[in-house]
């Protein structure tokens, strides 16, 4: 009896329900069972069902860069650990690929996709390419950057945002014109019928800081400096759908400020080590309660000496906050094994140390770590006209 005959005896809805509970790498294998299964898995109904299931089991996504090679891992975020102070989990390798040019640092994350604005891959050989990747499926596509008019127009950042209403991804590039002393923007809607960059202007002249971005409920947030002397700091709030800007003045700014999703609201976390980069570690948290009224809530937490873990007591960095409010920290430059992730619960004042197995396999030098909290696997990647399959531990035919 072949696979189609087996399938006939099982209700299709039941098959889809079972498949939707599997990880993405297992879904890739299931496509090879039969043409019928492949057809079912590609249906929009199934991709939506899979996304719904995946949303209930968020993961910590980890990207490791070493000399131009990128590897993507995921591991489950701990739940119900009930008094435990340490756990050991295994990292799941999703894919890896190589850059063609010098290694570049920095990326932008939005709704399960990662944008590497300065990355080139040997297949295309174009110096002006960026790469957008779906780490769950192994697919990636190219974003050809807009040509600049002259050397006096300088791009400051290249950001990825997502509009959850129209389900559109957009790339935003702020460009500062030194002659006109103004900030223009190039913006690209991915997957649009008319492909092309558009220009929009900002009501204020500003230069983005290098603290990164975060997109929450269709608003892309990043930090910048304004004024002619560029000596005032603001929070830029860009509505991805309407393409309107709001600027909020900040009374405090630090180069280590991390933008986070704090229970559905924009949060900023500053970290301050008391002694030589070690514990105790002070975390100052600002949560944006109301954009129109510019109302903020503030909290201060301290990870004390009795919280520390000897292997990772120095140079930790905040990478995000889980949906339940736990602050996640890692060492972003790694030379030692094994790899640790720390989850600080501010309500209970507890610190959970998670040792991650399998992350350092094949790594032999200093490498950089990027981590993204509450990553949800998504099978969709229809935002690019042409896509490619990155090298992974699975064969090419197993990729979407």
From Swiss-Prot:
InterPro entries: F-box-assoc_dom_typ3 (IPR013187), F-box-assoc_interact_dom (IPR017451), F-box-like_dom_sf (IPR036047), F-box_dom (IPR001810). Gene3D superfamilies: 1.20.1280.50. Pfam families: F-box (PF00646), FBA_3 (PF08268). SUPFAM superfamilies: F-box domain (SSF81383). It comes from Arabidopsis thaliana (Mouse-ear cress). SMART domains: FBOX. NCBIfam families: F_box_assoc_1. PANTHER family: BNAA05G37150D PROTEIN-RELATED, F-BOX ASSOCIATED UBIQUITINATION EFFECTOR FAMILY PROTEIN. Residues 4-49 form the F-box domain. This is Putative F-box protein At1g30920.
């Amino acid at each position: 009896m072949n696979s189609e005959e087996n399938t006939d005896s099982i209700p299709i809805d039941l098959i889809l329900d079972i498949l939707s509970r599997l990880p993405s790498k297992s879904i890739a294998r299931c496509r090879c069972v039969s043409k019928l299964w492949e057809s079912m898995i590609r249906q929009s109904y199934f991709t939506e069902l899979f996304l719904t299931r995946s949303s209930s089991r968020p993961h910590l996504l980890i990207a490791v860069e070493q000399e131009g090679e990128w590897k993507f891992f995921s591991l489950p975020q701990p739940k119900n650990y009930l008094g435990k102070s340490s756990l050991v989990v295994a990292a799941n390798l999703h894919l890896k690929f190589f850059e063609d040019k010098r290694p570049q640092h920095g990326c932008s994350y939005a709704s399960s996709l990662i944008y590497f604005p300065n990355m080139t891959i040997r297949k295309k050989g174009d110096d002006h390419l960026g790469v957008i990747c779906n780490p769950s499926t192994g697919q990636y596509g190219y974003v050809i950057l807009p040509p600049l008019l002259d050397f006096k127009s300088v791009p400051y950042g290249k950001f990825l945002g997502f509009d959850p209403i129209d389900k559109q991804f957009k790339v935003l590039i702020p460009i500062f014109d030194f002659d006109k002393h103004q900030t223009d923007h190039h913006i690209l809607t991915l997957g649009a019928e008319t492909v092309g960059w558009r220009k929009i202007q900002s009501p204020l002249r500003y230069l983005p800081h290098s603290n990164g971005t975060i997109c929450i409920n269709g608003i892309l947030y990043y930090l910048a400096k304004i004024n002619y002397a560029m000596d005032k700091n603001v929070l830029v709030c860009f509505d991805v759908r309407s393409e309107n800007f709001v600027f909020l003045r900040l009374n405090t700014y630090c180069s280590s400020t991390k933008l986070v999703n704090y229970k559905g609201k924009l949060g900023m976390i500053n970290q301050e080590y008391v002694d030589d980069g070690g514990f105790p570690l002070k975390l100052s948290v600002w949560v944006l309660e109301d954009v129109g009224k510019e109302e903020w809530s503030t909290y201060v937490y301290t990870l004390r000496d009795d919280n520390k873990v000897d292997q990772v007591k120095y140079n930790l960095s905040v990478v995000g906050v889980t949906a339940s409010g736990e602050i996640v920290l890692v060492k972003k430059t790694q030379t030692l094994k094994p790899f640790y992730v720390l989850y600080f619960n501010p309500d209970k004042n507890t610190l959970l140390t998670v040792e991650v197995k399998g992350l350092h396999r094949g790594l032999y030098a200093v490498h950089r770590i990027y981590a993204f909290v509450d990553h949800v696997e998504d099978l969709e990647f229809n935002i690019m006209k042409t896509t490619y399959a990155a090298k992974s531990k699975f064969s090419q035919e197993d990729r979407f």
